[in-house]
Amino acid sequence: MATLASSTKPQKWVSLIAGGVAGGVEAASTYPFEYAKTRVQLLRTSKSTPSNPLRLIFTVAQQEGVGALYTGCSTLIIGTTAKAAVRFVSYDTIKNSLSDERGSLSPARGIVAGVVAGATESVLAVTPTERIKTALIDDAKNARQFRSSLHATQVLVRTHGLRELYRGLVSTTLKQSATSAVRMGTYNILKESFKAHDIPPTLFTTFCMGALAGVVTVYATQPFDTIKTRAQGVQGAGLVEAIRNIQSDYGVRGFWKGSSMRLGRLLLSGGIVFSVYEKMTYLLHSRAGVE
């Protein structure tokens, strides 16, 4: 099987396009898991709420229709396309400046590159789109006041001002920085390890590395995701208030609420996003005549 990447350092335009395509494909493919995770995190304690992601997805599809599983999907696809493009171009730019003459990156430097990339994508793309997506899913639990992503944006801005789209900026930036650091850092460690053992980066090995990075990311960063979601509900909450509410409602275990839902998504998305990114990078470099 042909390898997906060479030792060539990706050019910025390649990272931007490949990252955007990878993010869009990943978001569209795994959205039902994201919907289930967000819905569970927004609900107060309820014995009637399924905690198994597949069961919740089936229940929602049966009671509300399959379309309900894609509530807020367009917003997430747009946001994920943008954030993945920003993440990969930021990460690759920093990685290129920190890597040695052989193009290798130490684990510590890989984590630093991930933190910076995560913070950058949070400010430029993630916070506004996550705010809208979370508000749409939260709104769908009751009588709807939002007709679409655009309508939700208009209502939120008209009612609370433009700054409302950045509600939860601190919690989102913490979550994105941690997620990107762990995800990109873990993938970099695995990639360097495979390279050291002369294992070629095929589609299969790349998917496995990405999937494993996704699993590590879920349990290492879930508290940040839970706090971010609570802060970005329709009513909104400050960082400290969100933490207190979660602790009061569920105890310490509540900070990992929705982890099984997120695991299903990141297991797939980790494999998908890195596989698509590496493949797109390879194809774009081939078209540009870069060896």
Curated annotation (Swiss-Prot):
Its main location: mitochondrion. Its EC number is 7.-.-.-. One of its GO terms (biological process) is mitochondrial citrate transmembrane transport. Pfam families: Mito_carr. InterPro entries: Mit_carrier, Mitochondrial_sb/sol_carrier, Mt_carrier_dom_sf, TXTP-like. Solcar repeats lie at residues 10-97, 105-193, 201-283. It catalyses: citrate(in) + H(+)(in) = citrate(out) + H(+)(out). The chain crosses the membrane at residues 16-36, 74-94, 112-132, 172-192, 203-220, 255-276. It is found in: Mitochondrion inner membrane. GO terms for cellular component: mitochondrial inner membrane. Disruption phenotype: Leads to fluffy and albino colonies, and reduced conidia formation, when all 6 genes ctpA to ctpF are deleted. It comes from the Eukaryota. GO terms for molecular function: citrate secondary active transmembrane transporter activity. Keywords: Membrane, Mitochondrion, Mitochondrion inner membrane, Repeat, Translocase, Transmembrane, Transmembrane helix, Transport. Mitochondrial transporter that mediates citrate export from mitochondria to cytoplasm. Both ctpA, ctpB, and ctpD play important roles in citric acid transport across the mitochondrial membrane and function in a redundant manner. Belongs to the mitochondrial carrier (TC 2.A.29) family. This is Mitochondrial citrate transporter B. It comes from Aspergillus niger (strain ATCC 1015 / CBS 113.46 / FGSC A1144 / LSHB Ac4 / NCTC 3858a / NRRL 328 / USDA 3528.7). The lineage of its organism: Eukaryota, Fungi, Dikarya, Ascomycota, Pezizomycotina.
